[in-house]
Structure formats: structure tokens, C-alpha cells
């Protein structure tokens, strides 16, 4: 596909996504088995459910048909970035500080194009990573110019999976709150018992606890009273 087509699709898709509360991650156009336009999007919190993809597809498809940024038949595909997502913006690197990343440079840096390491932070126009594939006597830290990065992708790790699950659960709770649905009660949980009101005090003195009236002593006294042996009063 000719250069600039992805940019034209992005110019059409980005306003639609922003209006729906999503963020455009990447446009990828493939010519294999026909033309496929892949629109990768996400929520502000980095999540994207199947329902979100369906909503974006319904909204974006007619807009692309009218704008017609591609001069041939194509298949529209809406996808989420996934756990091992690409990093394309400054905010992507900032959000994933502490995680492992693979970077392919479009322009060689220090005579190499491939880097792998932990993201330490963003400094100016570069991203600092601590490489995990250097010799013991070499400095593992390197700052790569973001403008020269051709492709950057997260490496699937247990830590990344755990964070993705946490974000997914948080997004699900937020969705339920937006719909006004309370989270279901856990099977083992019981409703909290309501405290019974305490007897009110009279004349500034604590109220006395009522004495029991159904003890053995009371029953014997009542029996003798019925036989006329004692006065029940």
C-alpha cells in the first residue's frame, strides 16, 4: 500500500474515536489476502473489551465509507492493543515504566537497531531503558531518541499480565457503576447485623436492665401462690 494511506485513515478515525471516549493507538494496513485496515484503539485506562470494539466498528465504518481514504475494497478490523501491546506515544512509555520492552530502531543508535530492557522513564525526547543483554563491564542504561524508534512492543511477563488483569477488573467495576449496578454479594458474605437500640436513660441515670421473669424461682412462687400458701405480691 502506498505511503500516507495509514495517515489518511488516522485523520478520519481519530476524531470519531475521541468523540466516543477512546484513544487511537495505531493504524496498520495489510495487503495480504486482500486489503485489511486494522484500527487499534483503547480506553483512557488502557483497556478495551469486545463490546468496545463492536461499538467503534459500528460508528467508524460509515464514516470511512463517506470519507473514502482508501481507493480499493478493504476489510475493517477493530482490535485492542493486547497485553504485549505496541508503544507508539510518549504516554505509552510513561504508563509502562518498570516493564520489559523490545525496541526496533528505524535509525541505528550506537551501531545497533535492536534493544531490549526495562523502561526506566522518559527523559526529554528520549526513553531510558536498562538493557538486560549487556556485558558485565558495560553500562546497561541507554536513552533512545523516540523520533528514531521504528517499533516498540511490550514483552509478555508475569508482572505485565498481573497489571493487565488489575486494570481489566477496575474497568469492569467502573462500567458497573456507570450502569448503576451494584457488585454482587460474595457467596460467603452475610449482611451486617443491625445493632439493637440501647435502653434510654431516665433522669440522667443509666436505664436498668429488666430482670428476668421466667426463672425457676418465679415458677415455684407462682405455683405456691395458686395453692394459697403465699401471697404472690
From Swiss-Prot:
InterPro entries: Ribosome_maturation_RimP, RimP_C, RimP_C_sf, RimP_N, RimP_N_sf. It is found in: Cytoplasm. Its main location: cytoplasm. Residues 167-233 are annotated as: Disordered. Residues 187-196 have a biased composition (Low complexity). Residues 167-179, 220-233 have a biased composition (Basic and acidic residues). GO terms for cellular component: cytosol. It comes from the Bacteria. The keyword S-adenosyl-L-methionine does not apply. Keywords: Cytoplasm, Ribosome biogenesis. One of its GO terms (biological process) is translation. CDD domains: YlxS_C. HAMAP family: RimP (MF_01077). Belongs to the RimP family. Required for maturation of 30S ribosomal subunits. This is Ribosome maturation factor RimP. It comes from Bradyrhizobium sp. (strain ORS 278).
